[in-house]
Design a protein with these regions (language model features):
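Histidine-centered catalytic/metal-binding microenvironments
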Residues: 20
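Alpha-helical transmembrane segments and adjacent TM-loop junctions that form the membrane-embedded core
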Residues: 1-16, 26, 32-281
Length: 281
């Protein structure tokens, strides 16, 4: 199971880095040729993307290590730390872009080579669709926080690239303020996205409980065992790919210690099967 998880997250990271590298090359060309502020915003976003993805790729290698004497609960929280790093990079790029865009609002420039910007934006949308498709499959198989954060960001990038395309087209037809206005919008999107990722990462670092729906599934599965009379003291958290669950089973007084131990093992197996993922109970 661990090998499967490692395969999926590394495949996602490699595909993402290849696609983003192609987009960076194309956007750099288009920005240098056109001088578009919104294209610069899109380029800045892609540069932050590849930095964050590379960082996630390195951190995931550490997060996938098995538990050791110094980290008895494993290294899964390294993913959440990577998420905080992503949030910081994205917030920084958003602030820089906002300053540049506001300056361009007061000093609008007529864009050149607009057609190149249009084709590069279409190319970027196609590359982003490939990334989102791969990441959706990976998240479905692994529930990786780092890949999930990336996926949310790239879904937003589809809108971002479409907005850049529209801004360049409007500027081509003489609406000079369209480019910096859209660039300010991109900056706002980056800042909002960084907050969302930071909040999700903080939840995992602070051991936030699993969703109520998942906790209810734990209760339902546990109570479905014929020898379980009740369940209390359920505590949960997530660390990387592993769901940590603690609970107390209420059993009949006449059960032997050996039978009670077997019931606990059987309930643990039932919960693990229910979630079809790595569970520590």
């Amino acid at each position: 199971h661990n090998r499967s998880y490692e395969f999926w997250v590394k495949t996602s990271s490699l595909v993402t880095m290849v696609m983003v590298s192609l987009m960076i090359a194309a956007k750099t060309w288009a920005w240098l040729a056109s001088g578009s502020a919104s294209m610069l915003g899109s380029l800045t976003d892609s540069l932050m993307d590849i930095t964050a993805t590379a960082m996630s790729f390195l951190v995931l290698g550490y997060a996938l290590r098995p538990a050791d004497d110094d980290h008895r609960f494993g290294h899964g929280k390294a993913e959440a730390l990577a998420g905080l790093g992503q949030a910081a990079f994205i917030a920084g790029s958003g602030c820089l872009l906002a300053f540049h865009s506001i300056e361009r609002l007061f000093n609008p420039l007529e864009l050149t080579h607009s057609l190149l910007g249009v084709w590069v934006s279409i190319f970027a949308i196609a590359c982003t669709l490939v990334i989102v498709f791969v990441q959706n499959k990976v998240v479905k198989h692994t529930e990786s926080i780092a890949i999930k954060a990336d996926s949310v960001h790239y879904k937003g990038d589809l809108i971002l690239n479409a907005a850049v395309l529209l801004a360049i087209l409007l500027s081509y037809y003489g609406v000079l303020y369209a480019d910096p206005i859209f660039a300010v919008g991109v900056a706002g999107y980056l800042l909002y996205n960084s907050w969302d990722i930071a909040r999700d990462s903080a939840d995992h670092l602070m051991d936030k409980e699993l969703p109520d729906e998942e906790k209810q599934r734990i209760l339902d599965v546990s109570k479905s065992h014929i020898d379980v009379r009740g369940v209390h003291g359920v505590r949960t958290r997530q660390g990387g790919k592993v769901k940590f669950i603690q609970l107390h089973l209420e059993l009949d007084d006449h059960l032997s210690l050996i039978r009670a131990h077997n019931v606990a093992d059987e309930v643990e197996a039932m919960i693990t099967k229910e979630f079809e993922s790595e569970v520590d109970i």
